[in-house]
């Protein structure tokens, strides 16, 4: 997996980020990790001090900007957006990478196919996601079941 970078936006994630990094470490995933942190988030920066992560101080603002900065900084063949809050399960990274190596530009994970699931989905978020997913299928001809879930892996050049 040394051809994979996890891009991890982390704003005020000092509590959850160490748990996420431990989970990744326990799976012996040999991948690069870029953690994008705003300079004013001193607590998250502190928990990263002795980690094996590359720390990228975010120049702009917001989640989308953190993704752009992290993905533009990635140099491996593949990159994966990986949340710092523990909402993604790293055990699926090998399967996702295999699909990318089977010549898919992007692999999107989903909460709505077995054995997936979401503990924090309400009826309203489920309906909203269903609506937006349907809209994206119609407008962009996407074969996707969960457009609002950002556990995405792809060729770094395609992201950039």
Each predicted region: which residue ranges?
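Cell-envelope/extracellular polymer assembly enzymes that use nucleotide-activated donors
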Residues: 3-5, 32
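Short beta-strand-to-loop acidic/aromatic patch adjacent to the donor-nucleotide binding site
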Residues: 77-87
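Short, acidic, metal-binding catalytic loop of nucleotide-sugar glycosyltransferases
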Residues: 22-31
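A conserved acidic beta->alpha catalytic loop
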Residues: 37-45
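Residue-level signature of catalytic and energy-coupling elements of molecular machines
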Residues: 17, 24, 70, 85, ...
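Acceptor/aglycone-binding surface of glycosyltransferases and processive sugar-polymer synthases
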Residues: 59-61, 65-72, 78, 90-160
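Short, structured coil segments at secondary-structure junctions
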Residues: 29, 50-52
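Active-site beta-to-alpha loop of glycosyltransferases that engages the nucleotide-sugar donor
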Residues: 8-21, 39
């Amino acid at each position: 997996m040394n051809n994979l970078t996890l891009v991890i936006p982390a704003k005020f994630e000092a509590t959850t980020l160490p748990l996420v990094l431990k989970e990744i470490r326990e799976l012996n995933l040999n991948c690069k990790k870029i953690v994008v942190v705003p300079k004013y988030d001193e607590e998250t920066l502190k928990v990263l001090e002795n980690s094996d992560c590359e720390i990228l101080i975010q120049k702009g603002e917001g989640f989308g900007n953190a993704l752009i900065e992290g993905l533009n900084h990635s140099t491996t063949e593949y990159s994966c957006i990986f949340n710092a809050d523990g909402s993604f399960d790293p055990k699926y990274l090998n399967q996702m990478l295999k699909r990318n190596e089977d010549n898919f530009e992007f692999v999107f994970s989903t909460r709505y196919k077995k054995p997936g699931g979401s503990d924090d989905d309400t009826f309203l978020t489920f309906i909203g996601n269903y609506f937006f997913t349907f809209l994206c299928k119609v407008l962009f001809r996407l074969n996707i079941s969960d457009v609002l879930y950002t556990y995405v892996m792809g060729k770094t050049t395609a992201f950039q």
